[in-house]
Amino acid sequence: MHLSLGAHWLIIAYIYVEINTKIKNRFFLKVILITFSSLIHFYFTAMLLLMNFIFSIYENFKSKDLKNFLKEIFLLMIPLILTMYSVGYFSIPVSDSLGFGYGIYKANMLTFFDPTSGLGQKNWSLFLPDIKNTKGETEGFGYLGVGIIILIFILIFYIIKDLKKIIQKHIKYFIVILLLFIIALSSSISFGGLKIVDFDLPIFLYAPLSIIRASGRFIWPIYYLLIIFSIFAFYKLKIKLRYLIFILLIQ
């Protein structure tokens, strides 16, 4: 078992720091989280780095501050690289870090609705049946739960008229979710048990992606972003409390 992969608090903590603009020294807290994640498991480091890179590009290019963008990259990468070096990340050749599995250990397009894609094929729902998927997709387990799924559909009904404005206002989060989802799906995309896309990547792309061969794990930040923003939107829209009670009961 990969016990270190249970440190999902790193993802939640990073999202909290990113969302809460009232926190002082947010950038340095992010640096600490990303650097510390390298001491736990590199998959968390890769996820947080990717999210941080997109957020940083968006914020700094929005303000047209290229100098600050480069400064942030430097201040992040120096402690991260030094930490990784000190614990032995670079003690083996890069070629030895490449692995088999990218395109196999991935997520399914229906992962958020599939209650039985996890370890041991346990069904985590009393209401939804198993959705057939392909071999290796247990790594991309991201079942949201019936309650959250219903909540998301309720929210879509409430915000459909202003959806374009909401996307524009929170575009950086939509970009992050889309990019993470593409990585999680890999180059072999399945919809349930149906494989709809399967192609070979050129070696210059496959080589670095094979380092994160279990790309399905990149569904985790999306999972938490969807839950956090669904609950936040529920509160902001002042939806009747009885809906929330019902959602909690069936979650």
PLM region spans:
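Hydrophobic, aromatic-rich transmembrane alpha-helices
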Residues: G145-I167, L178-I182, S230
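Perimembrane helix-loop-helix junctions
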Residues: E18, A46-I78, L155-I166
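Membrane-interface micro-motifs in multi-pass membrane enzymes
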Residues: M1-A13, L39-Y43, M47, G142-L144, ...
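Membrane-interface helix-loop junctions at the exits of transmembrane helices
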Residues: M1, M84-P93, P115-W124, F174-R213, ...
